[in-house]
């Protein structure tokens, strides 16, 4: 029997110390990594529940284990809410991550060696869209498209590559692109060569759910996402579709289980159900609208301070700062900003002369700060502090001044009040 009064603090003080330190770091540092956000206490409560004890291979009503009647309720809630959120008629909430959701789509619809056409990682795509270092670039013949000199997706290039290489699947989506994607144009290109259109909307799923960013579900054969980032849920993946035929649904269901996964993480699925309920609340739309307003305020301020934003600005939650020609690298900028309690990530930019471990760019995003309660003026201030540090990354006095300002701002907007 486990006594209920045993806590990590008393049983494992080393781990407790690390958890406490990370909790404090999240309160004291401003989070600008575009793929990060804060979950609600209710989501964390679900993730820490006894549902973690239950093995539940299969799907609701069709399990390979007994005793699943209550986890069936939890998973069905997640499925139904997810469908409602995106206007989908198919939803799978079992993928452990966005990468595994993407893997499921590839394995369901392709054969090893088939050609896929995806966005280059160096131009704003994702590892799982055909990067050579990823399984998607090893198992499949990956052809990559990019952005033009204005930092915009070159749809003419996408079409030319599609007509030349005849991919079986066109992949749309990104990890570092700040404009609106023309999903209809992608579908038209895919249709020209008889390819599936697969959309990875991981970064903008919350914006899509709130109607702040165009939905790909009207155009794509299948769509995946993570459940954190702008959706503000637990770390995990989902697959959704609208108008998918019975054959496609059967392939997707069977590839997730038993194809690439065994037992689902029922505690995480419960957390997803909570997050989807939160995303259906009226306030979620206002939150996502503010995310975009904050990103635009930050981008415009950085531009005014002399920093280039790839594509010239942002229409979503993120921006890519291009520092080619600047004395500071992305790696050094990340470190300097970290000393000022501003958390960002270095990121390659188009035609980057530096290696992916060094880079000439920074990716910034506003989902997390908006969750804290930041509005436009806060993000203008924050962008000016970022520019101050980037202008003098080795100046300890500047870093100390910015750190003090950031600390005051963080105290004004606690993550968990």
Curated annotation (Swiss-Prot):
CDD domains: SHMT (cd00378). Its cofactor is pyridoxal 5'-phosphate. GO terms for molecular function: glycine hydroxymethyltransferase activity; pyridoxal phosphate binding. Its EC number is 2.1.2.1. Pfam families: SHMT. Homodimer. The modification N6-(pyridoxal phosphate)lysine is found at residue 229. Catalyzes the reversible interconversion of serine and glycine with tetrahydrofolate (THF) serving as the one-carbon carrier. This reaction serves as the major source of one-carbon groups required for the biosynthesis of purines, thymidylate, methionine, and other important biomolecules. Also exhibits THF-independent aldolase activity toward beta-hydroxyamino acids, producing glycine and aldehydes, via a retro-aldol mechanism. Belongs to the SHMT family. It catalyses: (6R)-5,10-methylene-5,6,7,8-tetrahydrofolate + glycine + H2O = (6S)-5,6,7,8-tetrahydrofolate + L-serine. Pathway: One-carbon metabolism; tetrahydrofolate interconversion; Amino-acid biosynthesis; glycine biosynthesis; glycine from L-serine: step 1/1. The record marks 228 as: Plays an important role in substrate specificity. It comes from the Bacteria. The keyword Ribosomal protein does not apply. SUPFAM superfamilies: PLP-dependent transferases (SSF53383). Keywords: Amino-acid biosynthesis, Cytoplasm, One-carbon metabolism, Pyridoxal phosphate, Transferase. This is Serine hydroxymethyltransferase. InterPro entries: PyrdxlP-dep_Trfase, PyrdxlP-dep_Trfase_major, PyrdxlP-dep_Trfase_small, Ser_HO-MeTrfase, Ser_HO-MeTrfase-like, Ser_HO-MeTrfase_PLP_BS, SHMT-like_dom. It is found in: Cytoplasm. Its main location: cytoplasm. NCBIfam families: PRK00011.1. GO terms for cellular component: cytosol.
